[in-house]
C-alpha cells in the first residue's frame, strides 16, 4: 500500500482501493487465518494504522478480521490512520467456510460522495449492490481476489467485468474493482481485472491483463480513484 501511495498519481487522488484480504493475503486455511487474523481494536492493528497515517488518500483494503471467536472477510475504510468504516463480506463462497458472513451493507462519505462496498463474489448477487444503492451510494467499491485454477480462470476471464456491468446497469452506480493478477505456481492464475466502470457500464480505465499496476479515474465531479 505504501508503494502505491507514493506514486504521484495516488497522492492526487482521493481514494486508493486494494484487493480482497490484501493485508494478510488470501489463503483460507485454518493455520493461516489463526496466525494472521487481526482484531481491529488490538495494538497490533493500531501499529499498522499508525504506519499508514501519513498517506493522504482514503484507503479501502481487505483484511482477515478476528472478532471474538469469529473470523470475517472484511474491507476497512481508513483515513489518516483511523478506521472510518468496515464491511464484512455477506456472500461467502464454499471455500470460505472458516469465515462468518456479514449481515450489513454500510456506506461511507468521501468528499460528499456516498460510497459502498461489495467484496468479490458479492457481485454475483444483485441484492448486495442494491442494498448499497438504496442508501444513496453513487460508487460501489469491489475488492476482489480472483486467483483461480487454470481452467476456471479461463472460463471466468471475461465474466468478472460482465457481472460487474450488470450490477452497474441495475443501480446506476460507478464501480471500481481492485483485483489480483499473475500466476501462483503452475496451477493458479489471476487475470483480474482491476478497472473502473461508469454508470453506463463502460470500462473507463483498466489495468492490462497479467500486469500489476493501478489505474486512475475521475468519478463524477468531486471524487477521483
Which sequence ranges carry the predicted segments?
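Active-site catalytic loop in hydrolytic enzyme cores
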Residues: 40, 66-148, 153-162, 166, ...
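Short beta-strand scaffold segments in enzyme catalytic cores
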Residues: 61-63, 74-77, 106, 178, ...
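Short Pro/Gly-enriched beta-strand edge/turn motifs at strand-loop
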Residues: 58-62, 85-92, 175-179
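CN hydrolase (nitrilase-like) catalytic-core segments centered on the catalytic cysteine
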Residues: 43-58, 124-213
Amino acid at each position: 500500500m505504501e508503494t502505491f501511495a507514493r506514486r504521484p498519481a495516488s497522492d492526487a487522488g482521493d481514494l486508493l482501493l486494494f484487493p480482497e484480504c490484501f493485508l494478510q493475503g488470501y489463503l483460507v486455511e485454518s493455520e493461516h487465518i489463526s496466525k494472521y487474523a487481526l482484531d481491529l481494536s488490538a495494538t497490533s492493528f493500531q501499529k499498522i494504522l499508525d504506519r499508514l497515517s501519513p498517506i493522504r488518500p482514503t484507503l479501502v483494503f481487505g483484511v482477515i478480521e478476528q472478532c471474538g471467536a469469529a473470523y470475517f472477510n472484511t474491507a476497512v475504510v481508513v483515513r489518516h490512520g483511523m478506521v472510518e468504516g468496515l464491511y464484512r463480506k455477506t456472500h461467502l463462497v464454499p471455500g470460505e467456510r472458516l469465515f462468518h458472513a456479514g449481515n450489513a451493507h454500510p456506506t461511507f462519505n468521501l468528499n460528499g460522495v456516498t460510497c459502498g462496498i461489495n467484496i468479490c463474489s458479492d457481485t454475483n448477487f444483485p441484492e448486495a449492490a442494491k442494498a448499497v444503492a438504496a442508501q444513496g451510494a453513487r460508487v460501489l467499491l469491489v475488492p476482489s481476489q480472483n486467483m483461480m485454477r487454470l481452467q476456471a480462470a479461463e472460463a471466468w476471464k471475461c465474466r468478472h467485468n460482465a457481472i460487474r456491468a450488470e450490477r452497474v446497469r441495475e443501480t446506476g452506480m460507478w464501480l471500481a474493482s481492485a483485483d489480483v493478477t499473475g500466476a501462483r505456481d503452475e496451477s493458479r492464475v489471476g487475470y483480474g481485472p482491476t478497472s473502473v466502470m461508469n454508470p453506463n457500464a463502460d470500462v473507463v480505465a483498466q489495468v492490462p491483463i497479467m500486469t500489476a499496476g493501478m489505474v486512475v479515474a475521475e468519478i463524477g465531479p468531486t471524487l477521483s480513484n
